[in-house]
């Protein structure tokens, strides 16, 4: 047996197994860091690509990540600590609209494409479901939380994203 380099002992098959487990734990894909997966959109996307579903549930206060968004809108509601969806914009969008459809009192919290940019939404007119309409969406990764105005309310929803 040859002397190991860097004075690291040879551990054989066991070290390969440990390395494989460590790699799989640390190399978790982005979609695994959300409750309901990822959405990848390019300009001109179809209506089907812009619709996802999930359900609300949680007691994590969304305002702890930001009290107000970049437009001065208050950030409210409760959700799970993990984002519900990961949105990947492959190119810049001049305008996007995100609309929750649940029939309940929902809220929206979107963080991205950097940790400092926040967009929040609450009621839409007379409708208690949340929506956000905003301009200048840069290409990148966005974390989306769908919350409810009250803690631990479970409600099925559809999220519609439109240009």
Features from the language model and the residues they span:
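Non-catalytic, beta-strand-enriched accessory regions in extracellular/secretory proteins
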Residues: 66-95
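Hydrophobic beta-strand segments within beta-rich accessory/binding domains
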Residues: 86-102, 108-109, 142-146
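Classic N-terminal secretory signal peptides
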Residues: 16-23
């Amino acid at each position: 047996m040859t002397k190991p380099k860097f004075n690291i002992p040879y551990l054989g098959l066991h070290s390969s197994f440990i390395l494989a487990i460590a790699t799989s734990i640390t190399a978790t894909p982005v979609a695994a860091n959300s409750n309901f997966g990822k959405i990848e959109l390019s300009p001109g996307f179809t209506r089907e690509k812009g619709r996802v579903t999930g359900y609300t549930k949680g007691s994590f206060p969304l305002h702890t990540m930001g009290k107000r968004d970049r437009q001065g809108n208050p950030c409210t509601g409760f959700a799970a600590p993990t984002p519900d969806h990961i949105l990947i914009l492959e190119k810049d969008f001049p305008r996007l609209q995100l609309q929750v459809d649940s029939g309940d009192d929902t809220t929206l919290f979107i963080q991205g494409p950097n940790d400092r940019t926040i967009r929040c939404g609450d009621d839409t007119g007379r409708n208690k479901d949340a929506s956000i309409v905003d301009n200048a969406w840069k290409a990148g990764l966005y974390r989306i939380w769908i919350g409810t105005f009250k803690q631990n309310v479970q409600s099925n929803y559809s999220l519609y994203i439109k240009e």
